[in-house]
A protein has these predicted regions:
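A cross-family detector of function-defining hotspots
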Residues: 270
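N-terminal accessory targeting/assembly segments
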Residues: 10-161
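Charged, amphipathic alpha-helical linker segments immediately N-terminal to NTP-binding catalytic cores
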Residues: 183-222
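Generic C-terminus detector
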Residues: 502, 509, 513-543
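Carboxylate/His-rich catalytic cores and anion/metal-binding grooves
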Residues: 163-184, 208
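Gly-rich Lys/Arg/Thr-decorated short loops/hinges at beta-loop-alpha junctions or inter-strand turns
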Residues: 88, 194-199, 402-408
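Glycine-rich, often acidic-flanked micro-motifs
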Residues: 17-59, 66, 224, 232-250, ...
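Conserved lysine of the Walker
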Residues: 255
Length: 543
């Protein structure tokens, strides 16, 4: 054990970073640590955060307090004359006035100014220098600084020296509550975005994911203004040909698993843009679910959780081994790590125009085909719909699937109306001859208890056939209800599962279930119909 005098000298040495002035942001704290290394942030976290520790695998373990997930009902966007007509107002983008924003901003600054030291991280959002956003994060917790060190694109020494003024600033005062009596506040949590000021204010939540999604929300506003499609998806590229593809899908559809392909480079796992020059990742890292993680289920993620990574809200055993099955704190345990920790990652995280765009859905009704080819109109319709379904709990012997519709497969982060993103997708599809596919990773031959889950082996074979071009030449037949072209053959996939009605023993039950699902699609689309073109409306299922 080191003598206490040596420990004191060592700990004081990590405080001796060059002062950084944040007075332009209204902050007067004398000690500001800018872009500390992971090693230094580890030491700060262990010293200054009560519950921080180092896991056996080397990752920093931190806890976000009472909030262990996003707080979408507490997100506000300033209603400003310059942008109010652009924004899709409603439960996703709840308006607040400029005065309320300034009250919350000042409250955050007042709190941050009471801290003995602050952490500042300057980095980039977007791997294409032509479109990247300079982001500054100001926070009071080393855990938050390390998290954004992993999630933003880390500048070189030269880039940091010439960084200049940021284009977007996050003030994370999440340890301090919002005043719930302030106009429009629903709780002591507030995540306020001003598009005009290019600032995000966080109060009353220490969940790190709010910062990541704040950056994505800003990208979702500014990218379409430049003719760039921002997307909530993963992206990969063939190691030999460089041909890229996009994978969209909500939670539980297999997006993460299917993106891990030894034949392909990972461009990114969550947030991307499609410009006139190709695709690029917005982020410099990955933020993966850690629940029930094993080296067998997700080997890439498991090995990436090491020194330099952050493990959030996990439970450790006495020897600091991580118990990924323990959900005592939350089901939403997470791990954040730099993308270069993935062996198959392509750096820089850019690629050419995608050859294929894949929408994943886990259809628990057992109605949708394992794979279908979509026209531009059908692609826009299903992109706006963003459908998947989960198996509900069984009560009195009845299992009823629960549908989820999330527009553009990323509803909580959209700023414009979903049709804006759908039109950009169709435009880029047509311009760059991208094929679009709907892949069902859910059930066939019936729903749960009657049919069978489509095997991962068969889904991987479908994805392989999409990527190698063979599925584009396969025979198809039009689905009488949904109207898209169902692939009737696919290499290494049994033909009997490809046409869903044929896979059901009870044809009448299939027809009734297909009609029911079509009705759910149509009811959901009523929300978007007013802004949709006649072409997109015509792509709706026929009941």
């Amino acid at each position: 054990m080191l003598p206490s005098t040596i420990v004191a000298v060592h700990l004081s040495s990590i405080m001796s970073t060059k002062p950084f002035d944040l007075s332009v942001h209204g902050l007067s704290v004398a000690t500001v640590h800018r872009n500390l290394s992971p090693s230094a942030l580890y030491e700060h976290a262990i010293r200054f955060e009560k519950d921080a520790s180092i896991a056996e695998n080397g990752a920093l373990v931190a806890y976000s307090g009472a909030k262990t997930g996003r707080s979408p009902k507490d997100k506000r966007v300033v209603e400003h004359p310059d942008s109010k007509n652009d924004i899709w107002w409603g439960p996703v983008n709840i308006p607040c006035d400029e005065h309320t924003f300034q009250i919350n901003r000042q409250r955050a600054l007042d709190y941050l100014n009471t801290r003995e030291q602050l952490y500042c991280f300057d980095g980039f959002a977007g791997w294409d220098p032509k479109y990247r956003i300079k982001v500054r994060v100001i926070c009071s917790r080393p855990y938050h600084a390390l998290f954004m060190h992993t999630m933003l694109i880390r500048p070189t020494k030269e880039e940091l020296a010439s960084f200049g003024e940021p284009q977007f600033v996050i003030y994370n005062a999440g340890a301090f509550p919002a005043n719930r009596l302030t106009t429009g506040m629903g709780s002591t949590t507030s995540i306020d975005l001003s598009i005009e000021d290019k600032e995000l204010i966080i109060l009353g939540t220490e969940y790190a994911g709010e910062m990541k999604k704040g950056v994505f929300t800003v990208a979702n506003y500014f990218a379409p203004k430049r003719g760039v499609l921002s997307m909530h998806c993963s992206a990969t590229a063939d190691k030999k040909t460089g041909a890229s593809s996009l994978l969209f899908g909500l939670s539980g559809t297999g997006k993460t698993t299917l993106s891990a392909d030894p034949k392909r480079h990972l461009i990114g796992d969550d947030e991307h843009c499609w410009s006139d020059d190709g695709i690029f990742n917005i982020e410099g890292g990955c933020y993966a679910k850690a629940i029930n993680l094993t080296p067998e289920s997700e080997p890439d993620i498991f090995q990436a959780l090491r020194f330099g990574a952050v493990l959030e809200n996990v439970v450790l055993d006495e020897g600091h081994g991580v118990d990924y099955t323990d959900t005592t704190i939350t089901l939403n345990t997470r791990g954040a790590y730099p993308i270069e920790f993935i062996a198959n990652a392509r750096i820089p995280c850019t690629a050419g125009h995608p050859t294929d765009v894949i929408f994943l859905t886990c259809d628990a009704f057992g109605v949708l085909p394992p794979v279908s080819a979509l026209s531009p109109a059908h692609a826009m319709y299903h992109f706006i719909s963003g459908y998947t379904a989960k198996v509900a709990g069984t009560e009195m012997g009845v299992t009823e699937p629960q549908t989820t519709f999330s527009p553009c497969f990323g509803g909580p982060f959209l700023v414009w109306h979903p049709s804006k993103y759908a039109e950009l997708l169709a435009e880029k599809m047509r311009k760059h001859n991208a094929r679009v596919w709907l892949v069902n990773t859910g059930w066939g031959g019936g729903g749960p208890g009657v049919g069978k889950r489509i095997s991962l082996k068969n889904t991987r074979a479908i994805i392989d056939a999409i990527h190698d071009g063979s599925l584009a030449k396969a025979k198809t037949q039009k689905d009488p209800v949904f109207g898209f072209d169902v692939c009737a053959e696919c290499p290494n996939v049994p033909s009997e599962i490809l046409i869903p009605r044929n896979a059901w023993a009870d044809k009448a039950a299939y027809d009734a279930t297909a009609k029911k699902l079509a009705g759910l699609f149509n009811k959901n689309f009523e929300t978007y119909a007013a802004a949709a073109s006649a072409e997109v409306k015509a792509a709706a299922p026929v009941v």
